[in-house]
Structures are given as C-alpha cells and as structure tokens.
Amino acid sequence: MAWDMCSQDSVWSDIECAALVGEDQPLCPDLPELDLSELDVNDLDTDSFLGGLKWCSDQSEIISNQYNNEPANIFEKIDEENEANLLAVLTETLDSLPVDEDGLPSFDALTDGDVTTDNEASPSSMPDGTPPPQEAEEPSLLKKLLLAPANTQLSYNECSGLSTQNHANHTHRIRTNPAIVKTENSWSNKAKSICQQQKPQRRPCSELLKYLTTNDDPPHTKPTENRNSSRDKCASKKKSHTQPQSQHAQAKPTTLSLPLTPESPNDPKGSPFENKTIERTLSVELSGTAGLTPPTTPPHKANQDNPFKASPKLKPSCKTVVPPPTKRARYSECSGTQGSHSTKKGPEQSELYAQLSKSSVLSRGHEERKTKRPSLRLFGDHDYCQSVNSKTDILINISQELQDSRQLDFKDASCDWQGHICSSTDSSQCYLRETLEASKQVSPCSTRKQLQDQEIRAELNKHFGHPSQAVFDDKVDKTSELRDGNFSNEQFSKLPVFINSGLAMDGLFDDSEDENDKLSYPWDGTQSYSLFDVSPSCSSFNSPCRDSVSPPKSLFSQRPQRMRSRSRSFSRHRSCSRSPYSRSRSRSPGSRSSSRSCYYYESSHYRHRTHRNSPLYVRSRSRSPYSRRPRYDSYEANEHERLKRDEYRREYEKRESERAKQRERQKQKAIEERRVIYVGKIRPDTTRTELRDRFEVFGEIEECTVNLRDDGDSYGFITYRYTCDAFAALENGYTLRRSNETDFELYFCGRKQFFKSNYADLDSNSDDFDPASTKSKYDSLDFDSLLKEAQRSLRR
C-alpha cells in the first residue's frame, strides 16, 4: 500500500500525505519542511482555511484515479505543478488555523470534528459487508465540537486495511484533514514525532458531552432488545429516543476514514453521534416531551357505567334540597391532571351527576337560597375541557361576588312566595311528584348518550354560549331591581313551579308537538290563552290542581330554531340568555312587558331562574315582541303617511303645472285674439285696482297686472273678455289720462313692447333670404356620393 511506503519517510511527509490524499493514496515525499514556529495564530481564518482545501479534494481524486494501480511508480509521476499547488495550499491554510481558549491552535477540535464528518460520509462498502447509510449533511463546527467523542486519537498507523475504492468515496468529504495535520505540525514543531500526534487530547467540553450523551439504554443494543425494554417502560420519550439509535447502530457499523479502526480503544461503534438522527434525538431529549404525550383518557368511555346517572332514591320535599358540590371540587374535576382521569369516578364524584341531581330536585326551601349559590359549572372531565381552564380563576372570583350579592337579593323575593309554594295542596304535591318522576325517568335514560357525546355539548355551546360566560352583572341587577320594585308579588306567586323550582325540561330539544301541550298563538288563527293565567286543569302535566299554572311543554320546542338563533351570545355585562321570554323575537303570548329571566344551559337541561321577584310582566331592559309592536306599527303608519304625503305633493305639483300651462295657453290665445292691451308710462304709485277701475269703462276685464321697471317707469297689462272692448280701449284710452299724468302708451300686447325702441325687425326681409345659397357642395350629395368622395380622398 502507498501508506506503508510513505511511513518510512519523514514525519512531515507522513502526516501531510495522510491528510491530503488519504491513507491509501500515493504520497509526495519531495516537499520541503517548513518552519512554522514564527506564525501568529491570531491571524488565522477558518473560512479561508476551509475554502483553500478545495484543491486537495479535487486533486486527491485525480491522484487516486491516476496512480491507483501503479504503487511502484508513485514518486516518479507526481509533477512539479502538483508540488507547487500543494505548497500554495499549505501556505494559505497556515493563516486559517483556529485558536482555542488557551491561545494554542485548536488541533483536537478540528480532529474531532473530522471524525464526525468522515463518519457521516460512510464508504460505499464496509469491511463487514453491510450497506452504508445515506450521506448526511455536513454539520457545522459547533456540532463537530459537541458531537465528537472526548478521547479521539489520530492513530494513522493503525488504519492499514482500507481499500482504494473505499477512500475514493471519501475524497469529496476530506477537506478538513489537511488542517488537522498542519495544525499539529505548526504548534508541536519541537517534537515532530507521531507519538505526539497520537497522544490523546482532553476536550474542554468533555464534561458537557458526558452530560449530554448520558443514556439509560446502551447505544449498541439490538433493535429487538430495545423494543422489549421500551415496551416495559411507561415513558414514550425513551422509546422514541432509543429505537433510532439502535437501528442506526445495526445498519451502520463503524469504519471511519480516519484510522479509528474497530480494534482501536476509541471504537466509535454504536456511538450516538454517528448520524443526524442522533442529533435530532438529542434535541428532542433536551427540549422535553411534555407536550408530545397523548391524552391518557379518551373522550368517550363506552365500557364504563354512566357516571352521570342520577340517584332514583331522591324524593321531593319542601325543606330538603340536595347540597350541590363545592366550587373547589367542581373546578378541580375539570382542571385535574391526566393521571387522575385514568381512574373511574363514582357517580357521586362527577360534576354532571351534581348537575342532574340539582336540576331534578325541587327547590322548595327558599331559605336555602339565602346561602351562597353554586358557581358556574364546566361541562366535562376530559382533555377537551382544558380549553376553559385559563379562565377558571376569573370565573371563580366572579361567581363568589355573584353569590355574595345574591344573598340579600333573594331575601325579599323569597319571603313573599316561599310559603305559597311550600303550603300547596295535596293535588299540588301530586303534581310535583309526577313532574319530578317524569324528569328522573326521562333524563338519565334518554339523555345518557347525549351527556356523553361531545358533539351535543359543542352544539349547546354554539347555540346558547358557554356556561362560563353566563354570569350576572351586578350593575344590571341593581338597575333592574329599581325597575322591579313597584310590582306586586301577587302575580309572581302565580308563576308556575315549573319555572321557579328549576326543574329539568325534558322536551326542550324535542321537535315533536302534541295537541295537549301545543302553544296557540293569536296570529295563527287558533284560540290562545295567556301563558300565566290560571287554567282550570294542567293538561300538559296531568295535574288536577286548579291554582297551578300550566306552561305548555312545547313552549321551547315549538320554535326551537328561532330560540336558538336569538340566544347565541352570552356576555358578561348582559349575561341574560336571549330566551322566548326575554330579548328574543320569538312570539311568546305574554303581555307587552318583558322579563329579565336568565336561562342557564347546564348538562343539556334548561334551567329557568327568574330575576329576584320580577315576573314576566315587569318592564325591564329586554324587549318583547308586544312592547316593540306599537313602535313597529307606528313606524309603518308614519311610513304610509309619508308616502301618501309625497304622492299628494306630486299630484299637487302636477296640477299646478297643468294650471300654469293652461294659463299660459290662455294668455297666448288672448294675445293672438288681440284682447290684451299694454298700458305704459303710468305712475309708480298706481295700483292694480286703480288701473282696473279706470280701464273697465271700455268693457269687462278678465285680468289686470301692474309691473315696475328698474328705471322707475311702470306698465301694466289689461286682458279684456272680448276683442272689441280691447280695440275700444286701445283707441280711446288716452282720454283717461289725468292732468298730472303723461300720455299712456297703448299697444296690443306682444314681444315688441318689451324691447328697446331701436329694435329692427328683420323678419320683413325673410322673403329675400335664400337658404340654399349657403349650402356647400356636400349638402347636395347623398350618402353614396359622400362615401365615394371620402374613399377618393383616402386614396390620395
């Protein structure tokens, strides 16, 4: 081999040829030794150093192809030009040596970087016959420093089994080798021996490398062992981290271009720094995989029992109310960790169970309402509920303020109608029991799948807003309290227990309509009853109570689309949901007043909470269809009246224009009939009545007008009924002049009377005028003649 021949020469030739050409390429022994002791390492530039090695990469391939099969004539076929170029490269690269923190040339840094570089550019055929992996991108200098092993040695003499073909594939990645050898030669000029070069260099960042490269699993384990071990481990991070290392360790046994043989103590076999995959794995390990772990609890558990099933043992009583879960437990269930979701919750621990229990129990004991009300409920205990956790603290604070403010609000409201509900008759008790049993039977069974379905919850949030936003505004409550103060509590006592008690409305989202519970509207042409009038029988709930009220169950199912379209937005300032009773356009057969009724959609149940003691008749900020109907009707009436006025004005203007045109025609006719006399040079103080009286002696006058000129002279027009009278006035009108007046100017009315005296009438000479004399030659031509004339002019 060429390497064995060169090993007998000087140390400089040995190192230089090994770096530039390779361990199995012909070497050049004629290069003179250079004294590099006076070089200043501070002037070295890494970029120019790496750029200057382009010749080495190209020439090494040329030399490999040219002298591959002739090792005996190696030194005879290297010409002087290659020697000169080699010297030029050496001289240029001496100025680009990097410097470490101690002021010495960073030889081992580049050497370690070369180990990684040559390792990435693996040869096409390995000594053990395994196929090489794909060539990875050349890492940066920082990656070379961090990813190189700590005790890399340059044992060039140990690499003696590589073939020429293996090295030929490395010629394009061998650029940094000359810098390694020359750097060693430049700063270790005192001892030029290969033993110095083979001395292990301790890396400054070895401690960092030990910390970064620490791994629980050995890097040289087989893929089957890794799969078995990772199956036993719970962390998915180790499984994703060790398998790429083991796969690359199996597919890529180590054969480096540098003489790090598998027999050397620095065997990089199974090293975690063989390729880019290990770098990516290391970056994942450093950054952490907390956000990559999948949720441990699926959104839907079909194999478990329904945790939201209400207890059937609860019985309604006037003074017993099931205590709702506390706020701490309610919010901890929604924002708990994922590990807690893996354990199955009991029915009493789920928040939706508390929702159903609360909604299915009749709240007769209104002294319990004086205590703090439960805060808002969040829907699920799954991973998709975590989106509302960011607002949990704000909602808790708002809910606490709400409950504190609600303590005093319900004292006045509950004291008046508390006894009315609690002291109801036996028939009313039967009615309440039937209602409660119906809600218990329908709610857990028919809505079981709906409560567990994420789409139904999302649909509820879409139409009615999220319950986290359904919070009362204290200012709004105070304002409405002043408005509601003047209303009697007697009408509120007649409100149905269905609304006051917060029972579940089973037919809320059912579109079915029964004849018994169908709501009749007066505009539909059917018989209508007031919603809160006392009905003789509660037909919708089959209750014999005469004093109870029967709000039809289809009130909220008759027109669900309109209700949902009007109740999409919850706001913190106006937290009342737009319901058929309030702020919506749904036609509720109530009075013209509106309500501040608030609807909380919790656990797919529609809970109606009336605002303090204000029934649906009380005037409030919400607008009902009846309150807006008069304004709407008046607007239509005003619009109709305005249209009528516009039409009348147009007709009047049309009539006036017709009258004016008629008067103008009559005037022209009178002028043509010579019935209009022009009277000029009258006194400026002459009135129309005076002028009319003076000229009426000649006949009946139809119209008389007086006009003033700018120069102070006045004139008038007198229209007689008959032409003969006009002629008489024209002939004898001068006799009416007084002694202090000038003579009148009397003419038949025409255009001449309004022009200057020097006006010349040119119409008398109209017979002498020949209009044909002014025509050009083109006027006498027809269209065809004109077209031909134009074409001839274009040809010219």
UniProtKB/Swiss-Prot annotation:
<dbReference type="GO" id="GO:0030900">
    <property type="term" value="P:forebrain development"/>
</dbReference>
<dbReference type="GO" id="GO:0031490">
    <property type="term" value="F:chromatin DNA binding"/>
</dbReference>
<dbReference type="GO" id="GO:1990845">
    <property type="term" value="P:adaptive thermogenesis"/>
</dbReference>
<feature type="compositionally biased region" description="Polar residues">
    <location>
        <begin position="114"/>
        <end position="127"/>
    </location>
</feature>
<dbReference type="GO" id="GO:0051552">
    <property type="term" value="P:flavone metabolic process"/>
</dbReference>
<dbReference type="GO" id="GO:0097440">
    <property type="term" value="C:apical dendrite"/>
</dbReference>
<dbReference type="InterPro" id="IPR000504">
    <property type="entry name" value="RRM_dom"/>
</dbReference>
<dbReference type="GO" id="GO:1903494">
    <property type="term" value="P:response to dehydroepiandrosterone"/>
</dbReference>
<dbReference type="GO" id="GO:0043565">
    <property type="term" value="F:sequence-specific DNA binding"/>
</dbReference>
<dbReference type="GO" id="GO:0042594">
    <property type="term" value="P:response to starvation"/>
</dbReference>
<dbReference type="GO" id="GO:0051602">
    <property type="term" value="P:response to electrical stimulus"/>
</dbReference>
<feature type="region of interest" description="Disordered">
    <location>
        <begin position="611"/>
        <end position="669"/>
    </location>
</feature>
<dbReference type="GO" id="GO:0032922">
    <property type="term" value="P:circadian regulation of gene expression"/>
</dbReference>
<feature type="modified residue" description="N6-acetyllysine">
    <location>
        <position position="449"/>
    </location>
</feature>
<dbReference type="GO" id="GO:0035865">
    <property type="term" value="P:cellular response to potassium ion"/>
</dbReference>
<dbReference type="GO" id="GO:0003677">
    <property type="term" value="F:DNA binding"/>
</dbReference>
<dbReference type="GO" id="GO:0071356">
    <property type="term" value="P:cellular response to tumor necrosis factor"/>
</dbReference>
<dbReference type="GO" id="GO:0000422">
    <property type="term" value="P:autophagy of mitochondrion"/>
</dbReference>
<dbReference type="GO" id="GO:0010628">
    <property type="term" value="P:positive regulation of gene expression"/>
</dbReference>
<feature type="compositionally biased region" description="Basic residues">
    <location>
        <begin position="620"/>
        <end position="629"/>
    </location>
</feature>
<feature type="modified residue" description="N6-acetyllysine">
    <location>
        <position position="144"/>
    </location>
</feature>
<dbReference type="GO" id="GO:0031625">
    <property type="term" value="F:ubiquitin protein ligase binding"/>
</dbReference>
<dbReference type="GO" id="GO:1990910">
    <property type="term" value="P:response to hypobaric hypoxia"/>
</dbReference>
<dbReference type="GO" id="GO:0008209">
    <property type="term" value="P:androgen metabolic process"/>
</dbReference>
<feature type="region of interest" description="Mediates interaction with RNF34">
    <location>
        <begin position="348"/>
        <end position="796"/>
    </location>
</feature>
<feature type="compositionally biased region" description="Polar residues">
    <location>
        <begin position="242"/>
        <end position="258"/>
    </location>
</feature>
<feature type="modified residue" description="N6-acetyllysine">
    <location>
        <position position="269"/>
    </location>
</feature>
<dbReference type="GO" id="GO:0014732">
    <property type="term" value="P:skeletal muscle atrophy"/>
</dbReference>
<dbReference type="GO" id="GO:0009750">
    <property type="term" value="P:response to fructose"/>
</dbReference>
<feature type="compositionally biased region" description="Basic residues">
    <location>
        <begin position="561"/>
        <end position="576"/>
    </location>
</feature>
<feature type="modified residue" description="Phosphothreonine; by AMPK">
    <location>
        <position position="176"/>
    </location>
</feature>
<dbReference type="GO" id="GO:0045893">
    <property type="term" value="P:positive regulation of DNA-templated transcription"/>
</dbReference>
<dbReference type="GO" id="GO:0060612">
    <property type="term" value="P:adipose tissue development"/>
</dbReference>
<dbReference type="GO" id="GO:0005634">
    <property type="term" value="C:nucleus"/>
</dbReference>
<dbReference type="GO" id="GO:0042752">
    <property type="term" value="P:regulation of circadian rhythm"/>
</dbReference>
<keyword id="KW-0539">Nucleus</keyword>
<dbReference type="GO" id="GO:0003682">
    <property type="term" value="F:chromatin binding"/>
</dbReference>
<dbReference type="GO" id="GO:0071392">
    <property type="term" value="P:cellular response to estradiol stimulus"/>
</dbReference>
<dbReference type="GO" id="GO:0045820">
    <property type="term" value="P:negative regulation of glycolytic process"/>
</dbReference>
<dbReference type="GO" id="GO:0071560">
    <property type="term" value="P:cellular response to transforming growth factor beta stimulus"/>
</dbReference>
<dbReference type="GO" id="GO:0071456">
    <property type="term" value="P:cellular response to hypoxia"/>
</dbReference>
<dbReference type="GO" id="GO:0000302">
    <property type="term" value="P:response to reactive oxygen species"/>
</dbReference>
